[in-house]
Amino acid sequence: MNKNKNLTINQTFELAVQKHQKNNLQVAESLYDKVLKVDPNHMGALNNLAILFQALGEDQKAKIYYEKAIKLKPNHAIAHNNLGIVFNKLGEDQKSKSCFEKAIKINPNHADAHNNLGNILKQLGEDQKAISCFEKAIKINPSYVNAHYNLANVFNRLGESQKAISCYKKVIEIDPNFTEAYWNLHVATSNIDESLSILKKLYKIDNKNTKAKIMMSVLQGYKGNFNEFNNLLASSDSNHPYTRSIKWVFSLPKLPKIFFNRWDFFDAVIALSENSRPFYEFGVSKGISFQYIINTFKKGFGFDTFTGLPETWDARSKGSFSNFGSVPKIEGGEFIVGKFEDTLPEFFSKERPKASLINFDADLYSSTLCALNYSNKVIDEKTILVFDELIMHKNWEKDEYRALNEFCDNLGFGYEVIVVSFLTWQVAIKLKK
């Protein structure tokens, strides 16, 4: 570094930028530090150090330097946007949202800020506002592939399948190698042959995509050809959670109906249910599924703390799926707030109407078993039980699946699997009491 000893501040900064661009981050950091020792208010060094630390995943340091840069230049839209990204990674959603809003106020044509704000709003359950943000980003930049993709995902989550399909196709038109769009497009379809065709295109682009390979074998199985799946069972993918899940389904006495997304799945279940009865849902979160189901049944009972998971589950941390204590306002919905072990004994101590369907979306073994035990009073031969995460995830045999089988073993019940949606992890059954 001695040869850099007599460089001016500007020369040192320019050298730091060169090292930064060549991904020599350690040297770049040292040079930016030298600039700041001479000039603590050097905007370029502050901003670039923030970018450098952000790239390294050192978000707390990145936050400090972005805040210093913004203090010097409050109208720096890019810095506000980048700080918003950092806050999002740190789990500070409201601060993240505020940063993106500031970036947009400074520069209304900042497409990235509109897209990022849309993602935060989606995380907060404000889907309609998120849609508006993604559409604004696309209006600014019609070829903004991530905005099209994010818009598709919101439509998919809301059950607007045709809009989602149109957006996924637009993503693929812009970027034919966008594999996630192919994957989600095949989920949004409702036809085995069409879904299989999409997966084949995906696999042609990425022949190491294990999930695509497994799902192609499933669809072939549903068409009567189990050769590919049998090959999977003899391969290194035999212990993949998808393979284990499908093996269980294929071992059932009767192959259940298959659907590709939660809304087609729910439509099929609702069509088989007693619509004159109310439904029950254990695990409401933001109420998206509850709202969809109640459009048919008009009356529903929902149980949740509305503060998220009580403990870590799968790859989700404690507090995931939180609605921040806010109870959804849904016409016809009656919500019982609190932990199942606290609220269910009192609720079911009174006579309750038999259930048309019960949606178990509690994820955890203990919570699901608790809900099953207490809701048994409203279950009869006509009730359909839906388990929202029964299969496909890493430890599926230890959670809702375990709770269901333990519940049935304890009471001497059997069950018939009637509908399955592999890609949304959902299974619908009827008990045989």
Predicted regions and their residues:
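Alpha-helical segment of the N-proximal tetratricopeptide repeat
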Residues: 7-38, 51-55
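S-adenosylmethionine/decaboxylated-SAM
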Residues: 274-433
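Class I SAM-dependent methyltransferase Rossmann-like catalytic core
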Residues: 221-276
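Conserved alpha-helical positions within TPR/SEL1-like repeat arrays
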Residues: 13-21, 44-55, 78-89, 112-123, ...
